[in-house]
Amino acid sequence: MEKVTNSAAAKPQGNNKKQESAYNGTAKDKKKPNLDIETTDSDLLSDIHLDGTKEQKVQTLFSKVFEDTGPSTAKTADRKRRLQAEADANNNDTEKASKLAKTSVATTDMDLRVTRKQHTFYMKVQALLAEHAEKESTKKASKMAKISEADLILFMTQKEIEYYMKVKALIAKCAEEGSKLLDNWTSSKDIAKTADHERRLQAEADAKNNDTKKAGQSAKESVATTDMQLNVIKEQMEHCKKVQALLANESKGAEKESKVLDYSTGPSTSSKEAAAAKTADHERRLLAEADVNNNDTEKAGQSAMESVATQGASATERKQSFSLGLEHTSPIQVNGAALACPLVRKSLPPGEANSCPPPPKRDPAAVKSSVKIIKVKAPEEGNNNNDEKEMSTETSETHKTDSVEEGRRVVKWIIFPIKPNFFFKYFWEQTACLVQRTNPKYFQSLISFKMLDEILIRHHLDFTVNLDVTTYKNGKRETLNPEGRALPPAVWGFYSEGCSIRLLNPSAYLTRLREVCTVLQEFFHCKVEANMYLTPPNSQGFAPHYDDIEAFVIQVEGRKRWLLYEPPKEADHLARISSGNYDQEQLGKPIIDEVLSAGDVLYFPRGTVHQAITEEQQHSLHITLSVYQQQAYANLLETLMPMVLKKAVDRSVALRRGLPLHTFQVLGNAYKANDCGSRQLLVENVQKLVTKYLIPSEDDIDEAVDQMAKKFQHEALPPIVLPSEEVRTVHGARSGADEQGNCVCDYKFNEKTSVRLLRANILRLVTEPDGSVRIYHHADNGLDYCKYEPYFMEILPEEAKAVELLISAYPYYLTIDQLPLKSSARKVEVATALWEHGLLMTEKPFK
């Protein structure tokens, strides 16, 4: 419905200038017109009495409606109607009781069906209208002006009108259905409301007979059943039996009852204080019901006011928590003035479980699988040898070490006591491997809870870009990232609500972790990534899935239960692309079900379906090292075959000839059954062309591997230059000026200077398709993934042999005089250029 149409329909026709003046917002006519409201809208728009012109009144109304003033009081109003209906029934005012009951049913049905946003919009309007109607109820109606639906629509935006009309139509429909339900109430004895009605009648009879104890018990049963019916929807009726069982033992199950009946769209977790408040509120409502039956009106009113106050406080707390889950967070107003941060404080208690219950814990001996899982117990802490001690890369001979062997040493440190050769023969890309230790401090230098807090304070991290907030509940995984910077109060607020925190690329902020990644990338010859996962107790942040990487899960703090499954399809083994989220029913029996404690390591190949859950009273902080992504033969062939085909097409005219005219009539899925001679001839011809022209040569394979290695140079982390290396590289060089102002460097190369590459894989010599020769390197890469364009140096073809000699000689040093170049000056010039780009290191530091 268009806004103009609404305004025109609402504006009265004729020559009544006074009435038109009211719509135009003027106040010339002292006698304010009486604008009636349609009876069908009486429940939605009650008469409001405000001061000022008609335009000012409506603007005042909507300025208050759309303020973030707190939670809706719809249920409170509905509760009052039910109490009033019951009181009218006691006074034999059947007609009034029936009317109030219809209104209650309509409001309740509306609560159950409208969306959260529509519900919030409608409830704010209804609550404000009810508030003003109550304040002005004692004044004379003849002296007050009324605001009709037409006035409201005049000042609504198009979006507000759409919401208003949807809710209005829905309420009218609910009222009609509620009327039918009320007419058939007494005859439908198989539904819960009939039993509730009978209990209330019995309670009234008992009250008249002065059977106070029995009346109170009947009233409690009535309220419990009614509340249960009001809070569940059709799709949740299967929970009714559970709710009734909890109601039977209310004193013990009050907290559980609040969990079952709370179906808000925000985070489902709630604090113990909130649960206790709900229990106390429920008891007050029961007491108010009993007081009404005993005609203690004053006491009943006091209990009802306490109940409303408790509901308002509880809803305010829920709203504050929910605001963190929105894509856009905005400040809220306190007392209509000062802005308050909508973030949850760090000191909030931990939330309840957010996870979808995985299969029950079973005896590992009972798990039967074709995959062989090997668990290794590391030696006791007192028997640790040097291999298990904290990794250290700085030695007196660091400048002489081999970076590839250093990477192997780090692998050995991670998987100790398993030897690397044994690991790569029996585990790598084959099956999972679990190493359990008794030393919880084994990986403590890499990261900690405190380090994460410092990162949030000292660095500018953005949600989604650097940090994710996730949750997995009721079989559904959600990402709750707001926009903007991830400040500590917001992050720890999410964590307190039971959400998991994933920090992307923590090695950019933690030198120790970055050192591990840079050394490992030398060994694996590929990008090595690290992600951090922090999960609160009794929670799960991610759905079951598999990844396209070889994963090393390093448990740093706390404990976490891991369940691994075989891929559902054979084609998913050693998967090249990560999967989507699996439902629990799609998975078979886990091939491993173990709890990782601090110091433990779990390895599993790509394609292994996995999920992880924290235990009660135990948080978890772990790092996942990801290696060997997109490093398969398939990736090589994807790079190689287009190159081979292009070269073959340029060389062979047979590949450039057109297809026979009858090709489309004999080849294709529709012609598989046609076993004619021309079809077979075409198939054999294509196969011969592939065999003859598309077999890659050794040079083709070298060129394709160079292209893959060039990609690694772009993705790799820059090397960490240790202090003993710094004085031998350009990073330790210093320059000054002489008396004439000329630049003077503190280094100078000659033919006797010994040099070598800084790292084994610091550069890649690539001959491009156009014939140019380039040196790609990652010495100047950023800490973020592919932050800059690839770095390269273009050299002369005859200078490539000098670079090749440096590559083959690593890790040994060569004198510049040994470089295969024609002149000594050219040898020194090439070595100096490579050193100044951070690619070479001298054997002795410059003085």
From Swiss-Prot:
Cofactor binding note: Binds 1 Fe(2+) ion per subunit.
Q: Which residues bind Fe cation?
A: 545, 547, 610
Gene Ontology MF annotations: 2-oxoglutarate-dependent dioxygenase activity; histone H3K36 demethylase activity; histone H3K36me/H3K36me2 demethylase activity; histone H3K4me/H3K4me2/H3K4me3 demethylase activity; iron ion binding
Where do the record's region annotations for Disordered lie?
A: 1-45, 203-223, 254-320, 377-401
Where does this polypeptide localize?
Answer: Nucleus
- Compositionally biased residues, Basic and acidic residues: 203-214, 279-288, 386-401
- Protein purpose: Oxygenase that can act as both a histone lysine demethylase and a ribosomal histidine hydroxylase. Specifically demethylates 'Lys-4' (H3K4me) and 'Lys-36' (H3K36me) of histone H3, thereby playing a central role in histone code.
Q: Taking the first listed entry, what is the main subcellular location of this protein, grouped into a coarse class?
A: nucleus
Which species is this record about?
Answer: Drosophila simulans
- List Phosphoserine occurrences by residue: 323, 330
Annotated family? Belongs to the ROX family. NO66 subfamily.
Its EC number is 1.14.11.-, 1.14.11.27
Check the record and name the PANTHER family matching this protein: MINA53 MYC INDUCED NUCLEAR ANTIGEN, RIBOSOMAL OXYGENASE 1
UniProt name for this protein: Bifunctional lysine-specific demethylase and histidyl-hydroxylase NO66
* CC terms in the record's Gene Ontology section: nucleolus; nucleus
